[in-house]
């Protein structure tokens, strides 16, 4: 099977992948030759018959590890490094490369990269740059942690004495539950006298300023609303007497205009129809109904002189016709 990250590949499956037909065949040339030399089934190969008795089986390897390595071996890389170092030490002792002098008697000359950079003529000394690369200032435990070396000497467990309790220590046990304890503490905190904080006066003044700002905003909002209302409503809300006087003046102005429009042909029937129309159109209860005076347009004013001029021309034509008849 191909993994998700791998490319596709075709696989051919044989009828007998383990090759059991060959292993079970006793008439093989190699097996007959070994049996003549004294070998029999169940014995291993070799002079002392210490070889493998089973057939070699093919195993699929899908990782990049070495032969015989498993994933669990990766976790023990520090132990592998220790084993490798021990092997190198044994090889050195066998070949005589290790000196007999102990490390305690040796006086190792420490090489400080930081001091060398200070002494050098060139401008190389940068504090963080040199200090980070200088390992002479590091301790042995730090180096072991960096390079992954395990400590060979283990601290004896028996030497560690258990911590003895002090003689002056006192332990108190209470019968209260956790909820009762915290309720008691909260009651004690509430009963404590509250000390006035000097910053509280400042906070109160700030709150008062904010309240004053809110009031000013509300007042300005009301002024804007009253300004946006129509003028007739504003007058009527505050002064009802003045509104009534304005209605009377409007009625007086509309009366002569209605008489002019009626003319001499106005009958009682038209008055009755007007009264009927007035009866039909009644204001709803609880509301004032004011008749707005009708505004006359400029075109209507021009209509009257035109009609008068037409009447004059008709009279002139009639007079001329009468004169002609009389002359004849």
From Swiss-Prot:
Tissue expression: Ubiquitous; expressed at low levels. Not detectable in a number of hepatocarcinoma cell lines.
Region (Disordered): 1-28, 147-177, 189-307
ATP-binding is among the record's keywords: no
Modified residues (Phosphoserine): 270, 273
Record note on domains: The TID (telomerase inhibiting domain) domain is sufficient to bind TERT and inhibit its activity. The TBM domain mediates interaction with TERF1.
Region annotated Telomerase inhibitory domain (TID), chain positions: 254-328
Compositional bias annotation for Basic residues: 292-303
Entry keyword set: Centromere, Chromosome, Kinetochore, Nucleus, Phosphoprotein, Telomere, Tumor suppressor
Segments of skewed composition (Basic and acidic residues): 235-261
GO molecular function annotation: protein-containing complex binding; telomerase inhibitor activity; telomerase RNA binding
Membrane-spanning ranges: none
Source species, domain of life: Eukaryota
UniProt organism field: Homo sapiens
Gene Ontology CC annotation, any one: chromosome, telomeric region
Name this polypeptide is given: PIN2/TERF1-interacting telomerase inhibitor 1
Entry comment on modification after translation: Cleaved by enterovirus protease 3C to promote apoptosis.
GO biological process terms, semicolon-separated: mitotic metaphase chromosome alignment; negative regulation of cell population proliferation; negative regulation of G2/M transition of mitotic cell cycle; negative regulation of protein ubiquitination; negative regulation of telomere maintenance via telomerase; negative regulation of telomere maintenance via telomere lengthening; positive regulation of protein localization to nucleolus; positive regulation of telomeric DNA binding
Annotated motif TBM, positions: 287-297
Family from the record: Belongs to the PINX1 family.
Localization per record: Nucleus; Nucleus, Nucleolus; Chromosome, Telomere; Chromosome, Centromere, Kinetochore
Pfam family, one: G-patch
Chief localisation class: nucleus
Purpose: Microtubule-binding protein essential for faithful chromosome segregation. Mediates TRF1 and TERT accumulation in nucleolus and enhances TRF1 binding to telomeres. Inhibits telomerase activity. May inhibit cell proliferation and act as tumor suppressor.
Positions bearing the site annotation: (Microbial infection) Cleavage by enterovirus 71 protease 3C: 50-51
Disulfide bond entries: none
């Amino acid at each position: 099977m191909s993994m998700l990250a791998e490319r596709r590949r075709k696989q051919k499956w044989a009828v007998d992948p383990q090759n059991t037909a060959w292993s079970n065949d006793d008439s093989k040339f190699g097996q007959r030759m070994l049996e003549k030399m004294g070998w029999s089934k169940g014995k291993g190969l070799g002079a002392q018959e210490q070889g493998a008795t089973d057939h070699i089986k093919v195993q699929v390897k899908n990782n990049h590890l070495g032969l015989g390595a498993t994933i669990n071996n990766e976790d023990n890389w520090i132990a592998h490094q220790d084993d490798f170092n021990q092997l190198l030490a044994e090889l050195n002792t066998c070949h005589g490369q290790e000196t007999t002098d102990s490390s305690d008697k040796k006086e190792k000359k420490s090489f400080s990269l930081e001091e060398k950079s200070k002494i050098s003529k060139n401008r190389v000394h940068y504090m963080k740059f040199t200090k980070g690369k200088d390992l002479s200032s590091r301790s042995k435990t730090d180096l072991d942690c960096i390079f992954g070396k395990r400590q060979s000497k283990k601290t004896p467990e028996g030497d560690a004495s258990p911590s003895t309790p002090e003689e002056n220590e006192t332990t108190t046990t209470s019968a209260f539950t956790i909820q009762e304890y915290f309720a008691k503490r909260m009651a004690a905190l509430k009963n404590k006298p509250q000390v006035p904080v000097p910053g509280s006066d400042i906070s109160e003044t700030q709150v008062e300023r904010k309240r004053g700002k809110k009031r000013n905003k509300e007042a300005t909002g009301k002024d804007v609303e009253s300004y946006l209302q129509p003028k007739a409503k504003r007058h009527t809300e505050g002064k009802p007497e003045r509104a009534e006087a304005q209605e009377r003046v409007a009625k007086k102005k509309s009366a002569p205009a209605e008489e002019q429009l009626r003319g001499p042909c106005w009958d009682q029937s038209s008055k009755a129809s007007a009264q009927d129309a007035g009866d039909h159109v009644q204001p709803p209860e609880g509301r004032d109904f004011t008749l707005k005076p009708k505004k006359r347009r400029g075109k209507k004013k021009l209509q009257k002189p035109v009609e008068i001029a037409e009447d004059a021309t008709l009279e002139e034509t009639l007079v001329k016709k009468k004169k002609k008849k009389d002359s004849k």
